[in-house]
Design a protein with these regions (language model features):
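Polybasic, lysine-rich low-complexity intrinsically disordered segments
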Residues: 16, 23, 33, 39-40, ...
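Conserved core of the sugar-phosphate nucleotidyltransferase
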Residues: 184-294, 298-301, 324, 374, ...
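Hydrophobic, low-acid, alpha-helix-prone terminal segments
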Residues: 8-15, 35
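Intrinsic low-complexity, disordered N-terminal segments enriched in polar/charged/small residues
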Residues: 21-24, 28
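Conserved N-terminal catalytic core of the sugar/cofactor nucleotidyltransferase
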Residues: 46, 51, 58-71, 79-86, ...
Length: 416
């Protein structure tokens, strides 16, 4: 039976076009034909119920054809070392043991509202083959390769100027590749609502999450409006990764949201912000004749060698006077630390988290054990430890010292 959408729409149009059309379908006394019709209607009902359950039908119909998605997949995730490392960062791993890598989950989620030809992936050039293996649906020309790690401002600039060359009327949704989302439909609804807002309002939109703790590893967004019922507000201040004292103050004030690293803007507006606040970067990338041509790889290699390591938060979001925030409510974690990993995972009766049934914990509490699946491990009489092994690196670290993990990754990287 053909259940493709065009066939179903054609069938529905026949049903709703009147009695005469229905009489042409339903033939009195023809039991075999009528059974086929009934079967098709039943299949149709179940098919439409499945679509409506996913909630994607209305979103797809309303999606602006000028909208693009940029998935940022160039980070190393060294706060999650050794499970996330330079050879295989966490976005390419199935860290939560759900059967799919983070980037695969991100693609499957966002591709419900964006066609493949309007999804771009930006990553380090050494990860191109991994992207092609894990996301074979994405055209090769939509994989943007960074020569050097230069943080989010250069990567967003690269994508913005490239997409502008393809479509000067474009809107871009920029998302991380390695975040956990518990409610896909609420997430997609917020993306659509943000796009609709930016189509009417000049400016930059970010999505904020209500904080659950005083976290120093996230950016904080202070909203101008104190009306909690308002979904979108203008941003008063934008602070990237505050110290603990400031984080405590932000958390206690109820005026701040976490920055989820999800941005929505028109290509014209973000390029104007680069001109205003990061003119050096604008000058480097404003050579559109070399983007979307065979000269692009050599051009990007030259440009990235001159780029500074700057985040979009510090380079633009903290400085711009045209920033808005949409309060998201879709269950979010960047899974960037072992603390965040512990919060997401199922625990045993002693608040321990492990990834394997070959790990035995006895008289131990509040531990995290993440080891290769065939590794037999016994943990006896210890509390609050992180025990993690991957690629011949074994780390045993007290959970209160988690902020030192980046040093370990750096030490072994330079030791080589």
């Amino acid at each position: 039976m053909d259940l493709r959408v065009p066939t179903l729409i054609k069938f529905l149009n026949r049903l709703k076009s009147g009695t005469a059309a229905w009489n042409n379908i339903y033939i009195k006394g023809n039991r075999r034909n009528n059974f086929r019709i009934l079967k098709k209607v039943v299949y149709l009902v179940y098919y439409l119920k499945a679509i409506l359950k996913r909630g994607t039908l209305n979103i797809q119909l309303r999606m602006n054809p000028n909208s693009y998605c940029l998935i940022m997949a160039g980070g190393i995730g060294n706060r999650f070392w050794p499970v996330s490392n330079r050879r295989c960062p966490k976005q390419f791993s199935d860290i939560l043991h759900c059967g799919k890598s983070f980037i695969r989950q991100t693609y499957e989620r966002i591709s419900q509202i964006f066609p493949n030809h309007r999804i771009f992936i930006i990553t380090g050039e050494e990860y191109e083959d991994i992207i092609k293996r894990q996301l074979p649906e994405i055209p090769d020309s939509n994989i943007l390769k960074e020569t050097y790690v230069r943080n989010t401002a250069p990567c967003i600039a690269y994508a913005a100027y490239k997409i502008k060359g393809l479509n000067p009327d474009a809107y871009i949704v920029t998302i991380p590749s390695d975040h956990f989302i518990s409610n896909d439909q609420a997430y997609l609804n917020d993306i659509q609502e943000g796009l609709s807002f930016i189509e009417k309002q000049k400016g930059l939109l970010t999505i904020g999450i209500t904080p659950t703790r005083a976290e120093t590893e996230y950016g904080y967004i202070q909203v101008k409006s104190k009306d909690n019922t308002q979904k979108i507000s203008q941003v008063k201040t934008f602070t990237e990764k505050p110290n603990q004292e400031l984080a405590n103050m932000f958390f206690d004030s109820d005026e701040f949201l976490w920055n989820a690293g999800i941005f929505i803007w028109s290509v014209q507006d973000i390029i104007q912000e680069f001109k205003t606040h990061m003119f050096d970067l604008h000058a480097l990338f404003n050579t559109e004749c070399k983007l979307n041509t065979p000269a692009e790889p050599a051009f990007i290699k030259s440009v990235y060698g001159q780029c500074h390591n700057v985040s979009i938060d510090v380079g633009i979001m903290e400085k711009s006077q045209h920033v808005y925030v949409l309060k998201g409510n879709f269950g979010w974690s960047d899974v960037g630390t072992w603390h965040a990993f512990h919060a997401l995972c199922d625990k045993d009766d002693h608040n321990n988290v492990t990834n394997s049934d070959k790990v035995v914990l006895n008289d131990s509490n509040d531990c995290i054990v993440n080891v290769p699946p065939r590794k037999n491990v016994v943990v006896q009489g210890v509390d609050n430890l992180i025990i993690a092994e991957k690629d011949n690196y074994l780390m045993i670290c007290h959970r209160k010292d988690e902020d030192k993990i980046k040093r370990f990754e750096k030490f072994f990287r330079h030791k080589k």
